[in-house]
């Protein structure tokens, strides 16, 4: 049972990772640093202006030293809690008169949407001196109204020695009570930072809780206007050029009018096979409407042909060394055939894996007798029929090889699954 749970958990983690990767690679996430970090908590943005990356937004784990300088990979923490003021209980406030009964007095919280943080408080309960009863009193946490904010609050109090999800508890005079508030941000705030007051009902004590929703990048607040890196035709924002309306390209180097377009997005679309395809098939960079492929072996108008993707033969060579790889398909030299150019047409027979049938050992030469000319019986197969039978035999062998390969893969998968179950 534990093995099955482990296997299911593993599959769930893999699926979640793939989903996050898709969100980070989406069109919206590539538009800006802010859009990137909002796409998913695992997304990060390369703010290195000299990076050659086509997609600046990626899973944080995908960045390498070669693709982006490590300290220039921007990935804010999903939750940050910072205590701003923390005077101890029973000390005097700055006015020299008021006794501190709630600690801390000011806390700032930064949260990404769909994430939460827990803030801990202590409260010193003191009854009215005129009250003579020694019976426990009810303390109740109160806060500002959060109805019109994207916040969701949960309250916990250490009550009777146990942490309970509640807003109230019966306490004794001079008892120090610990309580916690869990803050969840459901979405970005349209009004900026949110200020909450946290106190105890009917008590003269209060603390400030300041919540900031992380829905953008700090670097977006400090653009480099008319940057030289953008040919002075745009602003450098978080390592990426935001071009003037008349310019396009990674570095604003392309005048749109010269390329027959009016928008930068139209110029980029010239590097797509269709509207849903990635720029340059994700194998190159778009330079003023033309693809420049990342590797010499990648070709095509949209870098759609990978000339390293042809099958390897048993001899370890692409196209068996008897042809060239053209856009993922072997184009065989004269005298060779099959998908991997492994079969010689001269032998008229080729076994599996492209290995020619062994030639017969040399026999002593003998002069064959001249056969007598005889008429061919009507039921004897013609040469074309024999060739047809050979082709059918070859096809049958290929089907048999393919079937055995499938069975082999199924067996491997079953063996792996059984090993996991026994783990």
UniProtKB/Swiss-Prot annotation:
Residues 219-253, 254-304, 305-342 form the I-EGF domain. The chain crosses the membrane at residues 403-421. It is found in: Membrane. Residues 380-392 have a biased composition (Acidic residues). Disulfide bonds join 24-217, 33-43, 36-68, 46-57, 219-238, 230-241, 243-252, 254-288, 271-286, 280-291, 293-303, 305-327, 310-325, 319-330, 332-341, 343-350. Residues 215-350 are annotated as: Cysteine-rich tandem repeats. Residues 1-16 form the signal peptide. Belongs to the integrin beta chain family. This is Uncharacterized integrin beta-like protein C05D9.3. It comes from Caenorhabditis elegans.
């Amino acid at each position: 049972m534990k093995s099955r749970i482990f296997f299911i958990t593993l599959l769930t983690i893999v699926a979640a990772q793939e989903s996050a990767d898709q969100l980070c690679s989406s069109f919206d996430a590539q538009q800006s640093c802010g859009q990137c970090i909002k796409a998913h908590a695992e997304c990060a943005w390369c703010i290195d202006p000299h990076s050659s990356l086509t997609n600046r937004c990626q899973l944080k784990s995908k960045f390498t030293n070669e693709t982006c300088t490590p300290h220039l990979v921007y990935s804010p923490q999903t939750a940050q809690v910072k205590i701003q003021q923390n005077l101890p209980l029973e000390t005097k406030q700055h006015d020299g008169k008021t006794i501190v009964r709630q600690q801390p007095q000011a806390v700032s919280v930064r949260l990404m949407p769909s994430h939460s943080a827990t803030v801990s408080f202590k409260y010193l309960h003191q009854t009215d001196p005129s009250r003579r009863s020694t019976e426990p009193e009810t303390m109740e946490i109160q806060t500002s109204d959060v109805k019109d904010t994207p916040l969701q609050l949960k309250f916990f109090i250490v009550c009777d020695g146990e942490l309970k999800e509640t807003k109230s508890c019966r306490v004794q005079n001079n008892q120090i009570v610990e309580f916690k508030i869990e803050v969840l941000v459901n979405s970005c705030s349209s009004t900026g930072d949110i200020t909450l007051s946290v106190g105890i009902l009917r008590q003269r004590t209060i603390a400030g809780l300041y919540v900031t929703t992380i829905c953008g990048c700090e670097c977006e607040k400090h653009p480099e206007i008319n940057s030289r890196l953008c040919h002075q035709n745009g602003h450098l924002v978080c390592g990426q050029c935001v071009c003037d309306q008349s310019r396009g390209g990674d570095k604003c180097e392309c005048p749109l009018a010269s390329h027959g377009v009016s928008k930068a997005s139209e110029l980029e679309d010239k590097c797509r096979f269709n509207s849903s395809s990635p720029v340059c098939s994700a194998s190159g960079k778009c330079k003023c409407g033309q693809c420049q492929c990342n590797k010499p072996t990648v070709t095509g108008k949209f870098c759609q042909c990978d000339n390293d993707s042809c099958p390897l033969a048993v001899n370890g060579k692409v196209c068996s060394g008897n042809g060239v790889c053209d856009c993922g398909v072997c184009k065989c030299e004269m005298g060779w055939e099959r998908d991997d150019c492994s079969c010689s047409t001269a032998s008229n027979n080729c076994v599996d894996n492209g290995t020619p049938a062994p030639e017969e050992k040399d026999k002593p030469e003998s002069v064959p007798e001249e056969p007598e000319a005889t008429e061919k019986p009507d039921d004897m197969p013609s040469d074309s029929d024999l060739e047809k039978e050979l082709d059918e035999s070859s096809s049958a062998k290929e089907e048999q090889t393919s079937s055995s390969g499938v069975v082999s893969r199924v067996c491997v998968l079953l063996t792996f699954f059984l090993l996991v179950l026994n783990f």
